[in-house]
């Protein structure tokens, strides 16, 4: 279908569905891909979302459910019968079925599995044994494997006998009679090699398979660094149990980016979540921010007498705190990116710290001169201008310590620094900013 027409259908569903009949909406949905329908559902309020989903054909529901975010997926699953869900997912790939079923209560999951064939049930139960954030949770058992003593001609004949190759098949895997992984051969190499050659002679053994327990973010990093389309997955005994393909890795990268973005703000992924759920997802970090606000306020309270005597200190002190907070967030962002890409280690963190410290000092000198001039022009007080300039440099330097040390500590404590880091670093720079500015004012002005 033409991309323009597809985008127009999506826009009509999102913007004008209330003005359409059910048949008109159904016809538009029939012309859209699963990902486009999922986008339409995620862009709709809950009541309209349920209506749109009810208009889908049963065979389309599985693909759409897989494309949805976890919260919306769970909402829709609660309104689908076990029989309908079994029918909806039966044509999906293993990893896609596992992704959907693992969001169900255990009792319901067992009922769904009991409706499936023995072969499908065994494959899915194997997939469910792995955590969803590991290579095992991403794998698909639809793999093509051959023996090392097969000839290339035999391999080609075997491939021709398949009804169709699994999606994203760019290589086949070589295993022994115990199904232990030995190597791989690209499809291109099979086609261009002499048919009389033996698999052992041309198979590649340089690239190691992925362990089933490997974290999904590490899987994504390996795919990115090696430009992979697919990769084999082995169990703890070195036996081939499946493969991961690039489409699954793209989903991991997208979900990780969404979680980091939403986690930093402490909000839910469902844009149209009910008020109660949305409030519940935000209240924790709002409460944490309230605690840190009281910490900053108590710091200011230590200098209440100074502020009473020199009122315009209250006007200027937010400048110092704000500049430190922004600088700390910049450093934090760099560190988070480095940690995510696995670029930061004990050998280079010292160099990075010195670099960030030098940047903060240079920025501090430039900005302190600017702030000093503005303050003097505003209040005609050279002492205040000098004090706020000094406090600004101090706080920018502290922002380096906060932006680097805080995420490393959170990582050490097995906490996600992307979620809690920003709250902690801004608290540090607020406190240091107020202490340095008001402390210097107490020493030199009182």
Outline where the language-model segments fall.
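Hydrophobic packing positions in regular secondary-structure scaffolds
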Residues: 1-264
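Alpha-helical transmembrane segments and their membrane-interface boundaries
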Residues: 257-393, 397-401, 405-419, 423-427, ...
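Active-site His/Glu-centered metal-binding helix of metallohydrolases
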Residues: 431-432
């Amino acid at each position: 279908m033409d991309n323009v027409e597809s985008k127009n259908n999506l826009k009509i569903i999102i913007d004008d569905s209330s003005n359409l009949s059910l048949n008109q909406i159904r016809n538009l949905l029939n012309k859209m891909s699963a990902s486009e329908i999922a986008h339409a559902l995620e862009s709709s309020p809950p009541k309209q979302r349920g209506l749109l989903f009810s208009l889908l054909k049963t065979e389309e529901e599985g693909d759409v459910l897989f494309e949805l975010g976890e919260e919306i997926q769970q909402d829709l699953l609660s309104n689908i019968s076990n029989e309908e869900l079994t029918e909806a997912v039966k044509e999906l790939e293993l990893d896609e079925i596992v992704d959907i079923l693992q969001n169900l209560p255990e009792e319901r999951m067992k009922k769904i599995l009991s409706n499936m064939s023995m072969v499908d049930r065994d494959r899915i139960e194997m997939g469910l044994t792995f955590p969803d954030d590991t290579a095992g949770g991403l794998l698909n058992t639809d793999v093509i494997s051959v023996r090392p003593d097969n000839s290339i001609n035999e391999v080609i004949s075997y491939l021709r006998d398949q009804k169709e190759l699994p999606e994203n098949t760019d290589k086949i895997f070589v295993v022994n009679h115990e199904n232990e992984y030995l190597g791989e051969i690209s499809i291109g190499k099979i086609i261009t090699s002499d048919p009389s050659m033996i698999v052992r002679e041309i198979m590649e053994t340089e690239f190691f398979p992925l362990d089933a327990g490997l974290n999904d973010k590490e899987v994504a990093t390996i795919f990115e660094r090696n430009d992979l389309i697919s990769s084999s997955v082995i169990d703890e005994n070195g036996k081939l149990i499946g493969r991961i393909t690039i489409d699954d890795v793209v989903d991991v990268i997208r979900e990780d980016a969404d979680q980091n973005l939403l986690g930093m703000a402490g909000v839910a992924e469902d844009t149209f979540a009910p008020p109660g759920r949305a409030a519940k997802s935000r209240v924790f970090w709002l409460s944490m921010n309230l605690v840190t606000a009281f910490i900053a306020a108590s710091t200011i309270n230590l200098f209440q007498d100074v502020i009473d005597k020199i009122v315009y200190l209250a006007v200027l002190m937010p400048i110092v705190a704000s500049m430190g907070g922004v600088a700390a967030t910049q450093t934090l962002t760099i560190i988070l990116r480095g940690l995510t890409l696995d670029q930061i280690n004990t050998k280079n963190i010292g160099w990075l710290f010195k670099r960030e410290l030098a940047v903060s000092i240079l920025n501090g000198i430039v900005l302190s001169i600017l702030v000093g001039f503005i303050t003097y022009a505003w209040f005609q007080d050279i002492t205040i201008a000098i004090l706020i300039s000094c406090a600004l440099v101090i706080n920018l330097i502290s922002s380096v310590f906060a932006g680097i040390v805080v995420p490393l500590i959170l990582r050490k404590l097995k906490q996600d620094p992307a979620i809690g880091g920003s709250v902690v670093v801004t608290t540090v720079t607020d406190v240091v900013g107020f202490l340095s500015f008001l402390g210097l004012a107490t020493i030199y002005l009182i």
